């Protein structure tokens, strides 16, 4: 399986997306922008919308866009790899500092290598600027569906990794994009040269030659990989 954010062990082609590759977010405020928490006037809050258990951070507001309350976002993955979640989801949860808010998004679209969107109730540039720096979360359940043999990185992290002989190799701690394919960063308990316990690490390419099965229901990934590699 290859790609920024999801994998496809069977086909070896670049898949859709998964956990999100973060892009740097400019934190310095623009002139006239607010440094405070999310302005309650910038979005309409539904008190019944509590923070979802399956919230996944997918981007951040980096600036206002235009004069009519639109915001510009840096997605943690590009279109077709994770930015799609920003485009599809209409319910967003925003976090700026310690304050969390819910926003219903009326429109979202691609704009160059960014996403621009209009949160309901953001009526002008000032209210949009007040959202600058807010982290954007959506429900995992609102992600676009993938093919049966494609996987979101966020669903792979935490799975056990075993080889075909049943030897435990550790747990997926992270997924890495090397520009060609995805790599599983697998952590396991080990012992250092000084005899003290430490965390060992294995880097296993997420491609079909090594990944033999992804068994999400069983919570594991089966690989063709030896413990002494």
From Swiss-Prot:
Gene3D superfamilies: PRC-barrel domain, RimM
Subcellular locations according to the entry: Cytoplasm
Annotated PRC barrel domain residues: 148-229
A cellular component term, taken from the record's GO annotations: ribosome
Disordered: region residues: 1-21
Matching Pfam families: PRC_RimM, RimM
MF (Gene Ontology): ribosome binding
Coiled coil: none
GO process annotations (BP): ribosomal small subunit biogenesis; rRNA processing
rRNA processing recorded as keyword: yes
Keyword entries, A-Z: Chaperone, Cytoplasm, Ribosome biogenesis, rRNA processing
Family (UniProt): Belongs to the RimM family.
Subunit description: Binds ribosomal protein uS19.
Comment on protein domains: The PRC barrel domain binds ribosomal protein uS19.
NCBIfam families the UniProt entry points to: 16S_RimM
Task performed by this protein: An accessory protein needed during the final step in the assembly of 30S ribosomal subunit, possibly for assembly of the head region. Essential for efficient processing of 16S rRNA. May be needed both before and after RbfA during the maturation of 16S rRNA. It has affinity for free ribosomal 30S subunits but not for 70S ribosomes.
Protein name (Swiss-Prot/TrEMBL): Ribosome maturation factor RimM
């Amino acid at each position: 399986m290859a790609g920024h954010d999801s994998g496809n062990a069977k086909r070896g082609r670049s898949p859709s997306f998964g956990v999100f590759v973060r892009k740097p977010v400019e934190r310095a405020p623009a002139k006239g922008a607010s440094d405070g928490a999310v302005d309650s006037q910038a979005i309409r809050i539904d008190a019944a919308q509590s923070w979802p258990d399956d919230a996944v951070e997918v981007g951040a507001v980096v600036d206002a866009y235009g004069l009519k309350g639109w915001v510009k976002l840096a997605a943690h993955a590009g279109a077709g790899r994770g930015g799609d979640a920003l485009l599809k989801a209409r319910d967003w949860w925003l976090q700026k500092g310690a304050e969390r808010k819910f926003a219903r998004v009326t429109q979202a679209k691609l704009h160059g290598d960014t996403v621009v969107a209009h949160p309901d109730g953001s009526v002008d540039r000032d209210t949009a600027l007040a959202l600058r720096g807010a982290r954007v979360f959506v429900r995992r359940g609102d992600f676009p569906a993938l093919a049966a043999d494609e996987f979101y990185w966020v669903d792979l992290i935490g799975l056990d990794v075993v080889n075909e002989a049943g030897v435990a190799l550790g747990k997926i701690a992270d997924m890495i994009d090397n520009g060609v394919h995805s790599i599983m960063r697998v952590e396991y308990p080990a012992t250092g040269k000084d005899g003290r316990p430490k965390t060992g690490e294995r880097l296993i390419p997420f491609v079909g030659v090594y990944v033999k099965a992804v068994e999400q229901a069983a919570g594991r990934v089966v690989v063709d990989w030896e413990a002494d590699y």
